[in-house]
């Protein structure tokens, strides 16, 4: 590799590449979440019959993974570059490999392996066939074909490609610690994120108010249900995300027993399933506006025949 791309150049390169493949460039969703998959741009849009092609950077918070900034590769918050394409292109793997070439990684010169790793997210009732992508022995991407999202079978199938940007940048820039990654010319990753990483770790493991978090979870859960009773999918899903992040903080604090943990996950999953069903019903009422006219007419006619 002649030129070592900065972190922001990696993002710009991926944005331009996936834009050229027909993806809309979305912005990060303004709510805490543990993965880019939980953004409504993936979770909601992966269900139902409408096509959807989008790419976006998603900061992802995982309180239990915080290490006070002392671990070179494990973080409270990391960045994912998320690509979702529905229906999945038949050549999605080739498109992905071509994206690596744009980053200066020639697949013919490196050991790139697709290692089977089927994916599941119990808290949202989602699962799919998946592979980890390993580059010279290091995982850099998760590849998933969604089979179920929010408890609903996906049709058509959505392909998700999730790049781990810190790992990818560490490889491209040949550094051992994420904090040594060059974010922009002359500015290191650690100069931006090391202090927040330490502070969030300290808060998550030592300072957070368990009683307040438990109370918040109950309030967020009730508010999600209340919004759903009014048919308000998007506000409800915001509160599902808040429930998820609050649970993750409780889990990091050690405030949840093994038995309670399963119960909390089930409560989040039940809400997510209702959100998913309500979203599809909402889109159906609108006549699935992103479908082309011919497909929409066929689909709505089939639904009409089923109800007779």
Swiss-Prot record:
| Entry EC number(s) | 6.1.1.14
Chief subcellular location equals cytoplasm
Location comes to: Cytoplasm
Query: Alphabetically, which GO biological process terms does the record hold?
Result: glycyl-tRNA aminoacylation
Protein's recorded name: Glycine--tRNA ligase alpha subunit
Subunit structure comment from the entry: Tetramer of two alpha and two beta subunits.
Question: Which keywords are on file for this protein?
Answer: Aminoacyl-tRNA synthetase, ATP-binding, Cytoplasm, Ligase, Nucleotide-binding, Protein biosynthesis
Give the family from UniProt: Belongs to the class-II aminoacyl-tRNA synthetase family.
Q: Note the NCBIfam families from the entry.
A: glyQ (TIGR00388), PRK09348.1 (NF006827)
Q: Which reaction equation describes what this protein catalyses?
A: tRNA(Gly) + glycine + ATP = glycyl-tRNA(Gly) + AMP + diphosphate
Supply the HAMAP family for this chain: Gly_tRNA_synth_alpha (MF_00254)
This entry's Gene Ontology molecular function terms read: ATP binding; catalytic activity, acting on a protein; glycine-tRNA ligase activity; transferase activity
Q: Which GO terms describe its cellular component?
A: cytosol
